[in-house]
Amino acid sequence: MRKTSPLLLTSLAAALALAAAPAMAQSKGDWTIGAGVHQVAPKSNNGSLAGGTLKVDVDNDIKPTITGEYFIADNLGIEILAALPFKHDINIAGLGNVGSTKHLPPVVSLQYHFNSAGKVSPFLGAGINYTTFFSEKTGGALAGSKLKMEDSWGLAAHAGVDFAINDKGSLRVDVRWMDIDSKVKLDGEKIGTVNIDPLAYGVSYVFKF
């Protein structure tokens, strides 16, 4: 269930205040580590189950994240995203909350950084996402049933801006899109696919070494 993220607006305002800081250039062989927080906001329409009779809605969640990026060339890096498990409540129209699940969505991306020697450096990336679901629980109208959500592979896109704090660190504001579609089983029977396809808004501190 996608909503406007106050986290993104607040972090963008803070980043603009740092625009006068020294630049953090990124060259071949450099490594960066980023630590921050992201809100995973599934798209507003998460699909239907049981032949289209049950409309699904998956809630947002926010958790700490970490990234590591290695620059294979000047301005061009390979990044890995990891996070603490995100937890989402699952709602069905007319039935309310019927369960929850946790997931981990690691992403590997190839990213190009524009103006990496400047104080403000936007970047774009594309890659692959693998999402694993676990700790599924049921409640409400589905209490007592066994819910299983299958793992998912999909494409991912990444865009953001780095605002240099000094020559070793920057404040990053970014947004990701991930293609996450999970086949759902209830008591061992396939009942459809949940289309999560979230945007992940975030802010982090990125350190170069």
Predicted features and spans:
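Hydrophobic alpha-helical segments of small multi-pass membrane proteins
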Residues: 106-108, 125-130, 151-161, 175-177
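A broad helix-preferring feature
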Residues: 22, 154-156, 162, 202, ...
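N-terminal targeting signals for Sec/Tat export/insertion, comprising classic cleavable signal peptides
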Residues: 34-64
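Cleavable N-terminal export/targeting peptides
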Residues: 1-29
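Outer-membrane beta-barrel translocator domains and adjoining extracellular loop/strand segments
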Residues: 45-52, 89-97, 134-144, 178, ...
